[in-house]
Amino acid sequence: MDIKHYMHTVGRQARAASRRLAGATTAEKNAALLAIAAAIRRESAALVAANQEDLTAARAAGLETAMLDRLTLSAKGVESMAEGVEQVATLADPIGEMTDIKYRPSGIQVGKMRVPLGVIGIIYEARPNVTADAAALCLKSGNAAILRGGSEAIRSNRAIAALVHEGLKAAGLPAESVQVIDTTDRAAVGELITMREFVDVIVPRGGKGLIARLLAESRVPMIQHLDGNCHVYLEAEADPAKALKIVENAKTQRYGTCNTAESLLVDRSVAAMLLPPIAAMLTAKGVEIRGCAETQAIVPNAIAATEEDYYTEYLAPIISVKVVSGIDEAIEHINQYSSHHSEAIITDNHPKAMRFLREVDSASVMINASTRFADGFEYGLGAEIGISTDKIHARGPVGLEGLTSQKWVVLGDGHVRG
């Protein structure tokens, strides 16, 4: 296969489809989404079977446990995928919305209209559900999508893509509105991230290695989805019951997600009280505790944490723990070591909670709630295309609005500039 020729064909088809989608009605887009959801639900067994083939190959290749967790698609997962697509159909269509219309002294009206970005290239690892989520969000926001999933999920992604195409055609929209790159050749990624004439933005979802490569090589603007080294800080006035419940949920509900807590900070004044029950809970659940010297003095089974531990997204039953002198050190530590994804403070002190909100430099900051809430569905955005750790264009969970832009509109009635 001539990868450059193939990718340029995909790009041209996506650009043509994006022009049709920009003018598609809400009814057309919703009809396609509902048809896609129905097809996914109907073919649940076939999707699970395709995914099992991917899993078998992945295990044989020695894929790590966290990646296998992300790759797995059960019948329940297929149903959740269909429901996610249906939910996007219920969301308000942002395209064409006009805001901030104001009269100017000249008599003209000036405002903004929300419009699609155009063609979105999405690069991701494992997680076949991203194929359906991304297709749905791009479609509803009027964008064409070029999807490049991980090679480990190629069979799952092909099966999902076929159902997406079926739904698009049933609604009278171009099948090329959503294209899954049908090759595992890494050269396809190199082409995708340099096709500025066809692709308007790249959304990468993957590990540091992938992001680093794309940052170095991409000629197309990116919305970064970096790793999730998330923190929970137990402040001096943390409620012990809330602290235990939130740490348990944030760390142990799922280990392989980017909104899982990887580091726990505890105020020195309450460490001796809060750490023993939390450590007992974590140990009972098989979580390895890596702590500072003060943590080790309180938790005998904790092993010594290294500097690298505090930077690490484990995606595994491991947590780093550090005792801090107070909120100043907690904020400083988080801003230095976190990936700027999601952080939580547990406290009944409102002024300190508000200071934490203001000063912690992350996409999502929470008070007395689990970091696991950092999710487009939980935020009411519907399925998300990723969680951006960037500051420009979109930050945090990226839903429909994050996949749009605004253009200025001027309304006149024969007005000329004097």
Swiss-Prot record:
Swiss-Prot/TrEMBL catalytic activity: L-glutamate 5-semialdehyde + phosphate + NADP(+) = L-glutamyl 5-phosphate + NADPH + H(+)
Highest taxon of source: Bacteria
Keyword NADP tagged: yes
Pathway participation: Amino-acid biosynthesis; L-proline biosynthesis; L-glutamate 5-semialdehyde from L-glutamate: step 2/2
One annotated GO biological process: L-proline biosynthetic process
Primary residence: cytoplasm
The entry's keywords: Amino-acid biosynthesis, Cytoplasm, NADP, Oxidoreductase, Proline biosynthesis
Function of the protein: Catalyzes the NADPH-dependent reduction of L-glutamate 5-phosphate into L-glutamate 5-semialdehyde and phosphate. The product spontaneously undergoes cyclization to form 1-pyrroline-5-carboxylate.
Identification of the protein by name: Gamma-glutamyl phosphate reductase
